[in-house]
Amino acid sequence: MKINIIGTSGSGKSTFGRRIAEALAIPYIEMDRLYWRSNWQGTPDDEFLATLEKALAASPDWVLDGNYNRTRDVKWRDVDLVVWIDRGFIRTLWQAVTRASRRAWHKQELWPGTGNRESFRRSFLSKDSIIIWTIKTWRSNRKRYEADMGFESQWNENVR
């Protein structure tokens, strides 16, 4: 089974995706791990798409966690199930703040070998703040996902 978990930053995609992959004993693929390089440098789109294609082709079954709208054609080409983690704004924001605080406090490296760690400054006070990103994108992501998961789409068995 090929599953893509989508949702706004802080909604719980990674936690849910890891649990599903573990329960099904299939590979878990985190798109952020494929995208982010050292010093928070993103991977160029052509390379990112090639890396994603390679990761998806490596196993007949997988759980993929991530949005990256520009990858939709690649990740949904053969997907069996799309799961949208549709949390309310307050809960999503709370989860994003809690996660960012925990990561900053523990100085946790997010993706091995990148050296990327969240800090209180980066998480709360910078233009690259994941908290600000969550606030800015929650509503637009929700509208996009509603359209993607709407009755007229191929994903018409919705459980919210």
Model-predicted regions and their roles:
Residues 23, 129-160:
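NTP-dependent small-molecule kinase module
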Residues 5:
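Hydrophobic anchor at the beta1->P-loop junction of P-loop NTPases
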Residues 19:
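Active-site signature of alpha/beta-hydrolase-fold catalytic machinery across serine-
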Residues 87-141:
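A glycine- and Lys/Arg-enriched "phosphate-lid" helix/loop adjacent to the NTP-binding pocket
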Residues 16:
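Hydrophobic positions on the alpha1 helix immediately C-terminal to the Walker A/P-loop
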Residues 27-82, 87:
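Conserved nucleotide-sensing/catalytic segment adjacent to the nucleotide-binding pocket
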Residues 13:
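Conserved lysine of the Walker
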Residues 9:
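The conserved Walker
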